[in-house]
Amino acid sequence: MSFSVDVLANIAIELQRGIGHQDRFQRLITTLRQVLECDASALLRYDSRQFIPLAIDGLAKDVLGRRFALEGHPRLEAIARAGDVVRFPADSELPDPYDGLIPGQESLKVHACVGLPLFAGQNLIGALTLDGMQPDQFDVFSDEELRLIAALAAGALSNALLIEQLESQNMMPGDATPFEAVKQTQMIGLSPGMTQLKKEIEIVAASDLNVLISGETGTGKELVAKAIHEASPRAVNPLVYLNCAALPESVAESELFGHVKGAFTGAISNRSGKFEMADNGTLFLDEIGELSLALQAKLLRVLQYGDIQRVGDDRSLRVDVRVLAATNRDLREEVLAGRFRADLFHRLSVFPLSVPPLRERGDDVILLAGYFCEQCRLRLGLSRVVLSAGARNLLQHYRFPGNVRELEHAIHRAVVLSRATRNGDEVILEAQHFAFPEVTLPPPEAAAVPVVKQNLREATEAFQRETIRQALAQNHHNWAACARMLETDVANLHRLAKRLGMKD
């Protein structure tokens, strides 16, 4: 089999049709899955000896949240080292990273696997993986044809990464230096709320403004602070953390500003405070609403004038510190109640950010669950950790009052429980492994029983026609998008439409 000019042109067109990178990537692998007739495809970005999924088709949604470290995935490591097309034999002893992650085929292992490393010049930037359930599924395609596919994918990925780099540099102050060497914190989530938050982080990171991060307990406020620091010109300098809620009143001032020898009982030597440690860097004050009014006044002075005094010292020290503060309280109400200074609130909230609770993030819960499953797999030395359909359904309908932190603990506990009831190093998480209180799954909708006026085959075909028509209307008559919505293979959908008389 060989690719026609029309097929290659179609792939190139799909890469140009999307508005954003994510849309282009999704179109690419959906088209490839249709052209190559594979069961699953994935586009991965390479970063710091791990592959990060950018777009998937035919794989469980939680794959988008997983991070595939080369040390734990020998097939992906082989792809990264190869420099050319890699075909894994059906009897390969190397475990496939997607075993158990193809919906409806959780109990079966992938039999055919092809890996295409993607390069920008001599640098590895990603990989394209193609998987199938039949051992000889990709034998009809030559290496030369697959290299052509890899070149198209590499060009799209390289351009996207270059655009991201240029956009980041354009947001930097004119005298700032690039900070590509600093490892970026990964914030997992594709929901509208998280997408907006990431944009706001990118905007404010390039400035030197103070930021107030608000959100419920467990939403990931510290992760937001890390992301701001790592994307800022201060990234090469320290990010210093202080939990204000854990500060005893007797040592709080010393922790913030330091002390000199003999300043109080037990001060046996000079000691720098958090502000000095964070000089030229960033200070993250977690649970800022717990500070006493007296300390709030001293903190306000530092923000106003940029100098500090160690406890017991009359001299002032100049510091250059960016302050990021976080709270799970409504500080506006705290100001009205007289428990928080209004002037400090306005100083801190120059650029406020709000982290959405997990219950408002839709399918992000599945992506995060995949991320934590992969963490557990590596930590416990397991070959795979897979979420069953029942477990995914449960996670999507639980409200998670403890947010992301509660999800992380729930996944870890479920892995331990599942491992205890199974032999071997493969873990499948079922709904019963999660101990969520008061979880009510939505009941199936009751429907009126229609009067039967046609035989079963006619009724089935009528239902199929109407379902396909509605899906096409919702997806602007894009057959690939329609197939994704109906969770079926696009080639099978075309064949069904022809049989139903919907296509010539």
Swiss-Prot record:
Q: Specify one Pfam family.
A: Sigma54_activat
**Pathway membership:** Nitrogen metabolism; nitric oxide reduction
Source taxon at top rank:
Bacteria
- Give all residue intervals belonging to the Sigma-54 factor interaction domain: 187-416
GO biological process terms held by the UniProt record: phosphorelay signal transduction system
> What keywords are annotated for this sequence in UniProt?
ATP-binding, DNA-binding, Nucleotide-binding, Phosphoprotein, Transcription, Transcription regulation
User: Signal peptide span per the entry?
Assistant: none
List the SMART domains hit by this protein, alphabetically.
Answer: AAA, GAF
Q: From the UniProt annotation, which stretches of this protein bind DNA?
A: 479-498
SUPFAM superfamilies in UniProt: GAF domain-like (SSF55781), Homeodomain-like (SSF46689), P-loop containing nucleoside triphosphate hydrolases (SSF52540)
Q: What InterPro entries does UniProt report for this protein, alphabetically?
A: AAA+_ATPase (IPR003593), GAF (IPR003018), GAF-like_dom_sf (IPR029016), Homeodomain-like_sf (IPR009057), NorR (IPR023944), P-loop_NTPase (IPR027417), Sigma_54_int (IPR002078), Sigma_54_int_dom_ATP-bd_1 (IPR025662)
Role summary = Required for the expression of anaerobic nitric oxide (NO) reductase, acts as a transcriptional activator for at least the norVW operon. Activation also requires sigma-54.
HAMAP family, per database record: NorR
Q: What is this protein called?
A: Anaerobic nitric oxide reductase transcription regulator NorR
Species source reads Escherichia coli (strain 55989 / EAEC)
Encoding gene per record: norR
